[in-house]
């Protein structure tokens, strides 16, 4: 691991930003404590410049040049004084003399480049994560999630990330990367069938209220059946293989589709579902250990 000097925290607060394939994922830390998380769409360069000038949601407003509070929640620019509301409620309007330190983990280089104008930014890279046996093209999101989960619940650890892609990433008890797998996630599989074929309909996630029949009698449910049951079978296969290799190993799941897939696993394989650690913020915990210098 390469040691690196990180920017000084302003009033012990700092921002973590995971730039994903579809959205931005944010966290506000106070020291080592995670206080608040939220998601936004990708932000225009003008808004990034405003944030870099220390302007919070209160100053950004809701006009064409700003961003609404529904998209970017208020960030307290200083620790809440006695008598003020918590981070989850209203916070005092105070101007930042300096923008909060920002630590970025990104899998989208074009988006990363936009944030270089932010004056107090640091991009976390793979060589800063103390995993052994990594390879150069291992995604920073996979590595940080694995590191965060392992440091929180112990190694050996298998992390399942149910996002745009469904990924499996594992490390043994000595923090050596065992390896993993990548396949299209739930939404991407539905989208590919809907967009790349002439007659198959686009199935939306919101349309799925319960497990479809295995052998469907209409096209929409046939697509649901094919995607869902093969994904669940894949999760079961990888998890069982992992536990056969590492009987004392742990399995954690994250990602935007984690609850959907967990519900299906609970219905079909409740014992297996009961072994899963459900934690959406593994990447942020991994970032926190890197920022704090914990290894």
Curated annotation (Swiss-Prot):
It catalyses: (R)-pantothenate + ATP = (R)-4'-phosphopantothenate + ADP + H(+). It comes from the Bacteria. Gene3D superfamilies: 3.30.420.40. Keywords: ATP-binding, Coenzyme A biosynthesis, Cytoplasm, Kinase, Metal-binding, Nucleotide-binding, Potassium, Transferase. The active site is at residue 141. GO terms for molecular function: ATP binding; metal ion binding; pantothenate kinase activity. ATP binds at residues 18-25, 164. GO terms for biological process: coenzyme A biosynthetic process. Pathway: Cofactor biosynthesis; coenzyme A biosynthesis; CoA from (R)-pantothenate: step 1/5. It is found in: Cytoplasm. Pfam families: Pan_kinase. Residues 71-91 are annotated as: Disordered. Its cofactor is NH4(+); K(+). CDD domains: ASKHA_NBD_PanK-III. SUPFAM superfamilies: Actin-like ATPase domain. Its EC number is 2.7.1.33. Belongs to the type III pantothenate kinase family. Homodimer. This is Type III pantothenate kinase. The lineage of its organism: Bacteria, Bacillati, Cyanobacteriota, Cyanophyceae, Nostocales.
